[in-house]
């Protein structure tokens, strides 16, 4: 991108080769006076779409995407990138990011925000009413000294494969105040994985995950999930806070968490350290709850207070198979339904 003629993505004179990228990588690695802007359906489909080198791409309307199976990078080659999708006025005042409105983006491969290489920084902000679809994996902060930030204020985000927030020595933060985030494929969601540090902060909107959800997974990992206000999480299969030598924390002051499927809600599993502090909101589990599970290295602590409500449809086990478990009840309510028993 040169921006020689105007801000219009579809104008050939704005590109260094004199053509709108088609079947080639589209690279925005500068932020000149004429900021690269997509304001209508793109006239040609690039291969990878890359925003790096301090570059900025504003997407105010229309549909854009990558070529079949190709990737989108926000931050690459030891540099930062900014992607604003939709009304860029919503990110005025020096706030940069990935703002989603009437436009639509389809990443046919992976979406990488400050990810897939060292020393990368990516910032994404999603708002208003359009759609973002990721056919591959979604990374926010991956690899050493790489930082990714993703904010969802409204709109619709759909991911078909794994989600990583803070992975492989990277730092990732996902903040959600509205909208919907849905994972459709049969793979896991990680917040803090394999020496990565991940945070998920949700005060509104709805997250729907159809597979395992791990907060703090693997050696050296630190994961934190904070839910408040009107936030809603629907998750199937295992929901584990602190797993396989990872450290995880769940703090809940409001909102609703519903765990469906046949698997379990586990706090501290297989050498993992998990801590849950619930002072409000409702957690419903349709199977077992284990606090400190599987071996002597597992440690789980669950503190229930205030107006917090916990409902478990099967057993509640505090300290299982040599694990160390602590259940503190200083208010709130615990209900077991069905054939549920409590073991301490």
Model-predicted segments: where are they?
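Small-residue (G/S/T/A) turn/hinge positions that recur once per unit in extracellular repeat modules
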Residues: 42, 55, 62-63, 81, ...
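GD-rich hexapeptide-repeat beta-solenoids
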Residues: 6-10, 35-40, 182-183, 206, ...
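Right-handed parallel beta-helix
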Residues: 63-134, 143
């Amino acid at each position: 991108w040169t921006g020689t003629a105007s801000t219009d993505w579809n104008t050939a004179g704005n590109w260094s080769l004199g053509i709108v990228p088609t079947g080639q990588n589209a690279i925005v690695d500068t932020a000149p006076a004429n900021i690269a802007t997509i304001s209508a359906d793109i006239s040609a489909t690039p291969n990878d779409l890359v925003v790096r080198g301090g570059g900025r791409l504003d997407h105010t309307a229309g549909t854009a995407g990558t070529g079949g199976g190709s990737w989108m990078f926000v931050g690459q080659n030891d540099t930062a990138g900014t992607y604003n999708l939709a009304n860029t006025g919503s990110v005025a005042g020096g706030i940069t990011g990935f703002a989603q409105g009437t436009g639509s983006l389809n990443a046919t491969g992976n979406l990488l925000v400050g990810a897939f290489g060292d020393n990368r920084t990516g910032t994404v902000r999603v708002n208003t009413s359009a759609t973002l679809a990721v056919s591959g994996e979604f990374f926010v902060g991956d690899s050493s000294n790489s930082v990714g930030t993703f904010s969802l204020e409204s709109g619709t985000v759909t991911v078909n494969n794994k989600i990583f927030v803070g992975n492989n020595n990277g730092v990732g933060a996902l903040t959600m105040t509205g909208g919907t985030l849905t994972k459709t494929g049969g793979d896991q969601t990680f917040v803090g994985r394999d020496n990565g540090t991940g945070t998920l902060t949700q005060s509104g909107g709805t997250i729907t995950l159809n597979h395992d959800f791990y907060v703090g997974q693997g050696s050296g990992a630190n994961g934190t999930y904070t839910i408040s206000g009107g936030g809603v999480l629907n998750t199937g299969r295992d929901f584990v806070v602190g797993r396989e030598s990872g450290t995880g924390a769940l703090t809940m002051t409001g909102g609703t968490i519903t765990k469906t499927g046949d698997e379990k809600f586990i706090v501290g599993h297989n050498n993992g350290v998990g801590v849950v502090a619930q002072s409000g909101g409702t957690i419903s589990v349709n199977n077992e709850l284990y606090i400190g599970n599987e071996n002597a290295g597992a440690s789980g602590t669950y503190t229930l207070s205030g107006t917090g409500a916990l409902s478990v449809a099967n057993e509640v086990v505090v300290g299982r198979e040599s694990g160390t478990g602590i259940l503190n009840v200083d208010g709130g309510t615990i209900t077991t339904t069905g054939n549920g028993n409590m073991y301490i």
